[in-house]
Amino acid sequence: MATIRIHDEQNTSIENQEEVEQFLKRQEVIYEKWDITKLPAGLKEKYDLTDEEKQEILDVFAAEIKDISERRGYKASDVISLSDQNPKLDELLKNFKQEHHHTDDEVRFIVSGHGIFAIEGKDGTFFDVLLNPGDLISVPENTRHYFTLQEDRKVVAVRIFVTTEGWVPIYEKENVNQS
């Protein structure tokens, strides 16, 4: 279940599932909970994935991917795995933590591990969405955001795209978020 942490003076947290869903809906962020128990035991918490294992993950969630793709016009998907096993993890995270936006939605379904999307809210205040296995999020097009990992520094996620080329980040600021 996802939780919210608002970057306000009170550092407000939202943990109740219904309140999380309502908050994200007001921000026009799509949030869904997919059945993670469908994932075969051999793929749970596995971060060094072969191409065949990545395809198996896509196959397991093919119906869900097809459903959201038909509703939203998405055309492609893949699986990304980030962990300390990747020697370039710190470099990747530095790039991910730069505020950016896209001209299409950024969609992630968390298969294993954890991730955080920091998203600029409608009022200009950023909020974090702390994601866990089974959580799907779609950050709307032209919404400033960045992604990072939680303390465990590992995630496997299905990425879903509007085009077969994937997405291209548009950076407007030079700074890199370090918080």
Swiss-Prot record:
Required co-factors: Fe(2+); Ni(2+)
Keywords linked to the UniProt accession: Amino-acid biosynthesis, Dioxygenase, Iron, Metal-binding, Methionine biosynthesis, Nickel, Oxidoreductase
Catalyzed reactions: 1,2-dihydroxy-5-(methylsulfanyl)pent-1-en-3-one + O2 = 3-(methylsulfanyl)propanoate + CO + formate + 2 H(+); 1,2-dihydroxy-5-(methylsulfanyl)pent-1-en-3-one + O2 = 4-methylsulfanyl-2-oxobutanoate + formate + 2 H(+)
Site features described as May play a role in transmitting local conformational changes, chain residue numbers: D105
Alphabetical list of InterPro entries matching this protein: ARD, ARD_bac, RmlC-like_jellyroll, RmlC_Cupin_sf
Residues given in the record as Fe(2+) binding sites: H100, H102, E106, H145
Domain of life from the UniProt record: Bacteria
GO biological process, one term: L-methionine salvage from S-adenosylmethionine
Keyword Metal-binding: yes
Function: Catalyzes 2 different reactions between oxygen and the acireductone 1,2-dihydroxy-3-keto-5-methylthiopentene (DHK-MTPene) depending upon the metal bound in the active site. Fe-containing acireductone dioxygenase (Fe-ARD) produces formate and 2-keto-4-methylthiobutyrate (KMTB), the alpha-ketoacid precursor of methionine in the methionine recycle pathway. Ni-containing acireductone dioxygenase (Ni-ARD) produces methylthiopropionate, carbon monoxide and formate, and does not lie on the methionine recycle pathway.
EC class of the enzyme, as a word: oxidoreductase
EC number: 1.13.11.54, 1.13.11.53
Organism: Bacillus licheniformis (strain ATCC 14580 / DSM 13 / JCM 2505 / CCUG 7422 / NBRC 12200 / NCIMB 9375 / NCTC 10341 / NRRL NRS-1264 / Gibson 46)
Pathway it works in: Amino-acid biosynthesis; L-methionine biosynthesis via salvage pathway; L-methionine from S-methyl-5-thio-alpha-D-ribose 1-phosphate: step 5/6
Site keyed Important to generate the dianion: positions: R108
Gene Ontology molecular-function annotations: acireductone dioxygenase (Ni2+-requiring) activity; acireductone dioxygenase [iron(II)-requiring] activity; iron ion binding; nickel cation binding
Site entry (May play a role in metal incorporation in vivo), positions: E99
Family: Belongs to the acireductone dioxygenase (ARD) family.
Protein name stated in the entry: Acireductone dioxygenase
Quaternary state and interactors: Monomer.
